Amino acid sequence: MTVSPFSQPLLRDKQEALDIQDLQGLVCLNLKVGSIRVFSGFYTRIDQVFILWGLICAGIFLTAQFLAISWDTQAIWWSTLTLVGSIAMVVLTWFWASVEKVRWLVYCWVILMLGGVVLTDLSIFLGWGEVLMRLCPLWLGLTSIGYLCTVLALRSRAFLLMALIHLLGMAIIPYFSEWQFFTTGLVMMISLLIMAELQWDMRPPIDSDLLTPEQKLFNQHQNQRRQLADLQRVKN
């Protein structure tokens, strides 16, 4: 008996039965003060990418909101940071995306991020006032497109929810007047950190020629463990 993907919660506590592609580069944190555990968690490379972009988004939009730094200087700083973030994203996600057969999704996100940077820089250096006044809706819109592409790739309702949140933000952000950058940064950062901290739903595992027979067998066992846990949750 298998569990339908639609029976999975959109978001839940992380499952510990991870596949090979998720175990690659796994970071485990166990912070203690004396004998008291303050925080414990683990982060796959995909989670690490979410955290990275969450911090980048916070840095970019909160700086634009609160610090008196020229637009030209910000454009140079944030273009460089976005380029570094895009390269890091490719490096961290490439094996996972290859196994899951969604390399095109990585390309999509890179194109969206770099395309957004180009539009932002042109609006600043060439004085495109109409674009400059709509940078927040622009970035919320680009991010929602990325999430929708992720929905197509992974059949995930959690990413659909994130896409809808960003589309809603795109529609209402003009009403926040002087707090547009703060609100945009907050929406993007919190969304990314939620996806990094929790387990999101996705389509069933697929067979990959990149894995050895032993790795495929390991993934099958891990999938069975996850299905058993899901069945127990449904029964309870």
Task: List the model feature ranges, each with a label.
Residues 146-235:
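Terminal transmembrane helical module of multi-pass membrane proteins
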Residues 36-117:
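Selected alpha-helical membrane-embedding segments in polytopic membrane proteins
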Residues 1-46, 229-234:
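N-terminal juxtamembrane cytosolic/stromal segments of multi-pass membrane proteins
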Residues 102-163:
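Membrane-proximal helix-loop-helix units in multi-pass membrane proteins
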Residues 52, 135-142, 184-187:
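Physicochemical signature of membrane-embedded alpha-helices that form the seven-helix bundle of GPCRs
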Residues 65-79, 124-135, 175-184:
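Membrane-helix interface and helix-disruption motif detector
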Residues 58-66, 114-126, 146-148, 166-178:
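Hydrophobic alpha-helical transmembrane segments and adjacent interfacial helices
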Residues 56-60, 85-88, 143-146, 169, ...:
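Membrane-embedded alpha-helical transmembrane segments of multi-pass integral membrane proteins
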